[in-house]
Amino acid sequence: MIQTRLKGMGVALITPFKEDDSVDYDALLRLVDYQLQNGTDFLCVLGTTAETPTLTKEEKDKIKRLIIERVNGRIPILLGVSSNCTRAVVETLKNDDMTGVDAVLVAVPYYNKPSQEGIYQHYKAIAEATDLPVVLYNVPGRTGVNMTAETTLRLARDFKNIIAIKEASGNITQMDDIIKNKPANFDVISGDDGITFPLITLGAVGVISVIGNAFPREFSRMTRLALQGDFANALTIHHKFTELFSLLFVDGNPAGVKAMLNVMGLIENKLRLPLVPTRITTFEKMRAILNELKIKC
């Protein structure tokens, strides 16, 4: 299989809900169109930002199918298939219809806190179970365990279909170590909007973005400029969004970006429990910043 290269700005797509708690599939397709029309380079479907743990198997299958049909090959689809049970991920890869999926995203197992050898064996089993490109996802703030640079590089060297890592450890030194020592066919992708610009200057190839749900045109332009070496103009855009970066996660993800999308009139401000909407004080701060940026409110 030809190796997919996920470069530029990917968006970790949210799942819009109606007031009755059902999935708003019409709003979902509008959001996909919004991304396609505004420079998004690839979509990350059914990741953390999609509130995937709260979705049923039927809902996940329908969301995947609708998005793949709407995108119709125009940009790559990165599908989240994470679980803290290795066997469950392997069975998903073997049994689910992966037509239209370009690569899969798999987080380090959460809650059961495996050792570095356990993490390696988890990804080894997954890489050997599929011909699809696999993207590692290191997010210790959610999983409770950090995948070290040594483990990441071991996986990158041992398996040709492990093509990238979404790095959200917040440890720039660790990320730089991976970038400096990685094989040529392995990429580092930022998992944090706020460090996308500095990480690209070190050699990362892009971001899987949360804020890109709301601002795909602006943030994809920043990413593209940085990748082209136009750091001055990229930095100007980066600084434009600094306050919003910090507000995104004050009340948890995707509460922040859903509030932004609601202010912009694109979705209902609805999450599924145990997640709840952002506080009114945060909401009003976002509204004020969006007005200042002359974003439609």
From Swiss-Prot:
UniProt-listed Pfam families: DHDPS (PF00701)
Marked site positions, Part of a proton relay during catalysis: 48, 111
One GO term (biological process): lysine biosynthetic process via diaminopimelate
Statement: the UniProt record of this protein carries the keyword Cell division: no
Active site: 137 (proton donor/acceptor), 166 (schiff-base intermediate with substrate)
Ligand binding (pyruvate): 49, 208
SUPFAM superfamilies for this protein: Aldolase (SSF51569)
Pathway(s) annotated for this protein in UniProt: Amino-acid biosynthesis; L-lysine biosynthesis via DAP pathway; (S)-tetrahydrodipicolinate from L-aspartate: step 3/4
Keywords, alphabetical: Amino-acid biosynthesis, Cytoplasm, Diaminopimelate biosynthesis, Lyase, Lysine biosynthesis, Schiff base
Cellular component terms per the entry's GO annotation: cytosol
Molecular functions per Gene Ontology: 4-hydroxy-tetrahydrodipicolinate synthase activity
Catalytic activity field: L-aspartate 4-semialdehyde + pyruvate = (2S,4S)-4-hydroxy-2,3,4,5-tetrahydrodipicolinate + H2O + H(+)
Localisation per UniProt entry: Cytoplasm
PANTHER family: 4-HYDROXY-2-OXOGLUTARATE ALDOLASE, MITOCHONDRIAL, DIHYDRODIPICOLINATE SYNTHASE
Subunit text: Homotetramer; dimer of dimers.
HAMAP family associated with the record: DapA
Protein family according to the UniProt entry: Belongs to the DapA family.
Task performed by this protein: Catalyzes the condensation of (S)-aspartate-beta-semialdehyde [(S)-ASA] and pyruvate to 4-hydroxy-tetrahydrodipicolinate (HTPA).
Name by which UniProt lists this protein: 4-hydroxy-tetrahydrodipicolinate synthase
Species this protein is from: Phocaeicola vulgatus (strain ATCC 8482 / DSM 1447 / JCM 5826 / CCUG 4940 / NBRC 14291 / NCTC 11154) (Bacteroides vulgatus)
Lineage: Bacteria, Pseudomonadati, Bacteroidota, Bacteroidia, Bacteroidales
